[in-house]
Amino acid sequence: MISMMETSTTEKKSNTDNSILKKIIIDSWRQRLSPIEWSLKLYNGFYNNNNNNNSNNNNNNNNNNNNNNVDNNEINSIELCEILLDLMNIGQSPSPLLVSYLRYAISIKLIGYNEFFESVYKFSSISRAQHFSVILDILFDVINIINYPSHHQNIFNSDNIENSNNNNNNNNNNNNNNSNNNIGFKVSSLSSSLKRNNSKIISTPIVTLLSSPSPSSSSSSSTSPSSQQPQPPQPQPLSYTSPIKKTVLIKNPDSTDSDEIMKVKEEPIKFKTTTTTTSTTTTTSTTSTTTNEISSSPPTNGNGEETTITTKTEDSNGINGIDSEDHKGENGKASPQMNGVHPGSDGNISHKRKEMDSNTIFDDDDSNGVDQHCSNKKMKHTDTLTQPQPKQIQNPQQQEQQQQQQENIEQNQHGNLHLHQPSQQQQQQQQQTSQPSLTTTTASAVTQTTTTASTINKSTKATTKKNYHKQLLSFTRLATLLFKVIEYYFQEDERINNINKSVNNNNNNNNNNNNNNNNNNNNNYNNNNNDSMDQNSNNPAVKYNSNNNNINNNNNNNNNNNNNNNNNNNNNNNNNNNNNINNILYKNSVKSLEILSIIQNNSTFKTLIYLAKYEFTLSSFKDLVLPFLAIQNSIRDNIVKQNIPSTQLISSQVKGQEFASQQTQLLNPLFQLIKQKYQKLFIDFRRILINKQEILPNHDIGSLVHGSSQSDKQIILSFEIIIDQEINGNHFKSSHTKLAISRGKPNELDTILNLKNNKNNNNNNNNSNGNGNGIDIGSSTDGSNKLSSTNIEEGNNNNNSSTHLNGNDQSQQSLDDEEPKQSQQQQLPPPSPPQQSHQKIQIQKQLQLIRQAKNLENVSDCFFKLLTLKTVKGLSDVEFLLEIVKILFQKLVRCNPNSNEYKKTRLFLLFKIPHFYSLMIDNYGNNNNNNNTNTNNINNNKNKNSKKSNNKNKNNKNNNKKNKNNNNNNNNNNNNNNNNNNNNNNNNNNNNNNNNNNNGESSDKNEINPEGSIGSNNNNDNDNNDETNTNTSSNNNNNNNNSNDNENVTDNNKNNNSNTKNNNNSNNNNNNNNNNNNNNNNNNNNNNNNNNNNNNNNNNNNNNNNNNNNNNNNNNNNKKNKDLNLHGNIIENVLYQINQFPSLYNVEDNIILSLIQILIKKHLVDINLLKSLFPNYHTDIDSIDSEIQSPPSSELSFDNLFDIHSIADIVKIKELIESLLNNSDPNNVSIMKRLFDFIKNHLINSFDYQDKLLNVLFNAKNIDYDSNKLLIAVIMYIFSDPLVIDTIDVHGYTLRLVMILIDVCESYGSSTTATTTEDIDIFKNENDNHDQKHLYFYFTIPFNLLYTLLIILYDVKNNKYNLDLIKSKLSESLNNKNNSRKSKSNNSSNNSINNINNNNNNNNNNNNNNNNNNNNNNNNNNFIQWIYNMIKDTNFSNGNGVNNVSTSFEFQFLKNLFDSDLGEDSIEKFQNFSQREYSSWDIVSKLPNVLYNIFDCYDRNIIQEEKVTQTMQLLFQYIPFSPIIVFDYLSKTKSSFFNVSPSSSTTTTTTTTSTTTTITTTTTNSSAYSTTTTTSASTSLPKSTDGKLLNGKSSNTSTTTTKNNGDTPTITTVITTMSSKNDKPLSLVEACLTNLNENRLLFRLSDYYKSLISEDHLNDLYKLFDPISETINLLLLSPKLQKFNELGYYSNQSTLFNSICLTNLSPPNQLSNMTPANAIRQVIDQFLTKSVSPNLSNLERDIKYIHMRLSNDLCQIVNLVSLEILDIILQSCQIESLYSIRAMELGGYILGGLIGIESLPILLNSIIPSWSEHIQTSLHGQLLSYFCFSSIVNSNALYYIQTDLCIQQSFKKFFLLLNDTMKRILSVAPLNGLITFCLSTITLFIHLNHSSITTYLYNSSSNTQLINQLYEIISKNQSLKKKQKLKQKKQQHNNNNGGEYNIDQDHIEQIQQQQQQYQKQQQQRKDEPNYEKLEEFIKTQYQRNNHSKLKSIFNILSISQLEDLSMSILNLSNFFLAISIFEDKNDLQYCSKLFN
């Protein structure tokens, strides 16, 4: 009850306050009070009423609310402003007195700036131009005083405020005038006057209008008045502090003195600014006060204007705020009405205000009622308003003269208040102490009074959030209002022009009719005269009749002329009225442009509007975008009008007056002004409002990096380093897949949240003003600098357009929805069954988009690095792609065509460049390049249009024949006219056809501005681009809606529809011209004279000439369009420039044609443009086009495997693979192998659809590993080829392949025959158990490929980046499995995660808890632990610490192994034992311990050599993956079994054709282990053509090697050494492996299995084991670099083997004799000074060698490299040395790429702080920041920020260091070097953050915004379902006799309900089969995204630290750079310091 009473009282209080304020304002206006008097009366009256109300409330209520009385007594500034604006809007012009009240209220901060902006937006009518002009003046002054507070000090101060001469006013306001006598107007005088007036008031709230007096004035006031002489007023600055406070005087209850001691309560207004004004504090004697009470108004001239000189000269009415005498009644009394409205009327003003807003056309009173009182006002915008200039500061002499004149005037005006400008010196002092920004604060005398601690500490997060939103909303509404003013002017101008055109057409028709009548009369007169002369020459009556006819004719002519004159006069009057209205609107629009230009030049204002795009996604921001787009449309229309009529008017024979009138109608003065002066304003606002991409700051580093004075090498090096590492490096190419940031596409979210259907849009652009129809912002992100909005889509009848604003952070809805997104989610309608199905369909669509977004997992890291460098260097898209493609072609020219580097570079060029280009198009929203044109359909449309025109000609001819038959008297004349009409129609139809052809070409070649950029938001604004094309502006968006993914075939019908629509538009235009010509001809045909017919012929000829001229002009415009498109289409332009290089002709393969072919098939290029650019490829392009339009049907089958020509073949291959699923028959191995050999050939040899084929292979769904073991074995056999691995590496599928292999090995390796037979009933029979007997067989092939990838090719053990990626992927997979696993398995998996995350040395703890019972429970632990131990190279334990030795794995396994023989029975027993007891992972993880025990027994002479070889043979024979483990163990151990004497060894290489076996041993000193190890080369076996280690019968024809002497040799390496005692056992082991391979006993099949397989299929089955031999060879040869090179074959297989070669290459001898410091200097100097592109592999070799010489000390090598780079920085002069940037990029690559991520903490936290004192110039600071940036980019730091706490802490320390440095710079002294270093580093981090994370990875699967909303929808659906079920149960209970029934009946009904529900669920699953799975998927995605979310680089800091850093940036730079560090713009609402 109390709360209800409180709400009711507050509502009543607000209503009463509003009425009180309105009453006080009206009474003040009637009494003609000055603003100061009005403010006193306002406060007194408002406070008295509130005190009375408060006393009544206190008597009724408790005393708990006493503390809130003062807060409730304050005046609501918004209500006050709204009342003033309402009252100002009454009448023909606003009352100047009310204007002065409003200005004064703003000046004393009674109305805040934010409140004023919002109130003006709500309560101002643009249509009432005279009223709104005054508001614009106030807005201009407000913006000026915020922007330049020191230059605009007296804008709001009411100077020379005169008192009324009326005695009534003097009698009523004596006390007020006495208080105003003192010019200083001290607070004490105010309080005394208030005390005299209101002696019973406890506390009187007033506002301190001016600053407190100076000490001298305060002391003088205390002395006697007689001792004081009147002094001239001294200027005293008034500073409105930040925060600005409204002061309230409160009585101190403790005071007992009669003079009430007042306290001031200060409350901050929401918007804090800094404004300074001046006040004069002087005192006068009592005699002067009494005389001045009767003094008159200030002196005026004859016109009633004041003679005072101010910065803004206005009349007395405008300045003083006093209406003229016409508004007063008799004897000077105020009239009872205020501009026709009684001041005592109710609150109907607001209703009238709403009616005024609805009226868009001026009333007669408004149009004619020019303000008489403001007509003499001299505006500051009076430069004829064509080129308004900003306010200029006057010279010191002029200021002194003005001050002297003002002082002389003020001596005669002591009764008025005068505020003067300070002197120039004081202005300069103020400029030094304060900055023109919103955040600076200055001291003010207002804050001399004390403030209570309670009011100061009220600022909380809620208030700051409200303040933040309030500021953003106020500035967006201000900009919206200003754009609406300009839009309204264009609308009115079009309306007036249309009226004038219609009037002119009517006048012309009337004139033509009158002329025709006159001509008829004259002809009749001539005929009568001729008859009278011939026949009746002597008859006087006839003569009299002829004279009467002449008189009648003359009278008719005179009447017609009089009518024409009257019409012309009426039209002139209307035109004058319209012109007057238009002139006022023009002035208002120019004022709006001036205010917008101030906003645009101020970074703070502009940033507040920019931030509103993230906060106000729909309602408020939509109102700002729509008028801006409407203005751009009108600008475009004016451009069209400016270009078109020049040809028509010149060619046509028009009179001079008509030409001038038409030209004035077409040329808009505001458009000319915008084109001349405000072009950059619209470009900048377009970038802020419409761009999806966030605008990134580009500081001085941009001009440094891509300066014109530098050579091309400085740009090339960084790109070349990254591309070379991508092609030749052995690192995983896609790393950010799991850590992708949560960004949602706006297009995706629209389809979910917009549950209602979008309405069709109208064709008219004017409809976009009300509801936004017809405008699409989604694709307008071209970054064009042109003035015309050529990229704005005009809605057609069949297009559903919606506006998408800023797809980066927050998703947008369509503009048709008026409610914001949150309210729409909360107010979802109750889901009826059709709505639920619609929702589910939307969810399914979104999940399809999520799955399609997974294609971004194949995006390489190099693309993000290149994008970062692109934005930093400021390269355009053409320059960016041209640089990359040029580097790739240069590599192709230098490489050998038979080398692996050439093949991989070619693959990268053909597939990754189109992939990158498609990503650029899709993610930046520029769909203009997706030109999926169909020339055949376009030609069909042309033919249809031509047929229609021919039909029209036939119809015209038939009509003309009918006209001939009807007119028998004038056959000849009519025939001539008809012929002319036919000629006209034929010519016009030809023009139609020509225009259709031209439009078809322009639609194919969409315009993209040359300066436009897809990938970069460049700040290079080209203001000189004034020329725009007219045809392309209407045809440039034909294909904007056709953004297509790489993986899908596009729909070409959309393009055809868009082309036909544009052609129809052109036809309509030409048809209108034809209709006009035909109408003129029909009017002229009504005349029956020969002269008129001749005139018609002339007119028709002129029309023909006009149409021909139009044709020529259209052709010329289309030629210009072609020229523009040459520069606009990015990839076409790049290929054209690349084709000009003559060195490309040396390349054997025509790579340009291959690239063009792939781009065409991916629908990324314009076919017609390519034909014009490459005429040599015209036939090839036509054939490709025809193949795309009519693709051949696929005829592929298992018996017909030839080539892949189309996507249909890819689909057919997918079907063939799916047909092989779930087929375990071993006889199908030949079919599988044949199909995958065919696939293998297409993976090795590139073709057009290679990426599609890989997508099919890696994105196959619903494959069960257990039921498809044979198929997976065949696939992994194909993937084991090194050339296939190269292809997979280029396309970015390697990391995914590794994870698939881990999943396969886990499923195969964790099962045994015992577990499978117990769990699955199918395998109980012996016939079905053959697969389970060969578990090791299926495990071997994927395990072999996994081992090869991880250990050999990608060297995970020595590559930290690959190691960390695998670890993160393993932890991610375990987290996913733990969510779906039971609680028992959860405990075991979590232990393994903890082991990995803790990185503990678990060397001796692997077998501590090994029991026989844990084999079935801890399989996953063994799998993860073995992978981790294998990666970390931990030592293997030998079973020590096991409690029960008899149950350990080693004991049981060795016992069975030693007890078994090589006989059939013993092998069978061992097979059954091992497969029953041990899984594959058990053997893999524990076999090294077994080997250790075997060789340890051999060393102790416990067993003999024969037993060792026997056990090895048994292992090799049945466990096929054991050789990998055995030889890996042999290469790492120190057993005496391998120790040989260090005797000299000789190596010979021979070529043989027979099978020989040689035993080789050699010694190597491995730098990795620093021990002498023994390895053996493989036995010499015959090699097939692909070089694999095969048996004599096997061969593979899919690959070929280089031929020597025309034959394919088989290479055998024979390494002979001195025999020793211990060579024999090793030789026996190798011989055992060789014999097993030769005799096909490497894997022993069971008899039952052999009985199922035929001979041919058995051979194919054995071939699957060929890659195992190669893996063993690589294990044996990889440490032996020399022998590896002598083999030659393996180095030619893949570029991934290059890393193995580089690890053991010997460095040059020069470096071995140098110190490490000199060696590093030598390496860097040689690299920089080489003219040819250097070899990066040699650089890597040299750096690793130097690092090894430093004993792998990380700190030393980082210090040496950094010192060398810093020496280069200090040696660089101000003009930039030639290799300065090149050296920075090289140093960053050495530290980040070669040394690694570990170098960054040393560089950022140690070296840079110590060397910062040496950075003295700005160039040094820029170079140092770029060096840090290059190190971070090359080290993949973005990944480690997510995973490594050490890297996070180092970056956090570095940011805090930058913050402290910037603070110290401000406090101590500015240092140019450190300032530029700090700002450049921050800017580069912003570019790195946006280019690498937010821009491209928001489409990833971890899409939190999308998934959160889907999750909310699903949860609501589930809750609604539960509610419905509860309702049904309640209804059933109510129906069943009040719920009384037996237990048995309840039980039966429950069972029946369950059955019914089960049946319904099954039916729903049939209808919607995947809905429940979709819900589970979304939930898991939701949990995953909440678990791990990617943060930006700056989000390592907390919100407070971020805010502190942004404040430091703001003090050194601008506001825009300060807020750019916030990745999530919602965090800005918690930053109170930034917005205070």
Curated annotation (Swiss-Prot):
GO terms for cellular component: mediator complex. Residues 778-787 have a biased composition (Polar residues). GO terms for molecular function: transcription coregulator activity. Component of the Mediator complex. Residues 212-229, 273-291, 300-311, 387-451, 501-539, 547-580, 754-770, 788-808, 928-943, 965-999, 1017-1118, 1385-1419, 1565-1584, 1594-1608 have a biased composition (Low complexity). Component of the Mediator complex, a coactivator involved in the regulated transcription of nearly all RNA polymerase II-dependent genes. Mediator functions as a bridge to convey information from gene-specific regulatory proteins to the basal RNA polymerase II transcription machinery. Mediator is recruited to promoters by direct interactions with regulatory proteins and serves as a scaffold for the assembly of a functional preinitiation complex with RNA polymerase II and the general transcription factors. This is Putative mediator of RNA polymerase II transcription subunit 24. Residues 51-70, 159-184, 212-451, 501-580, 754-840, 928-1124, 1375-1419, 1565-1608 are annotated as: Disordered. Belongs to the Mediator complex subunit 24 family. The keyword Transcription applies.
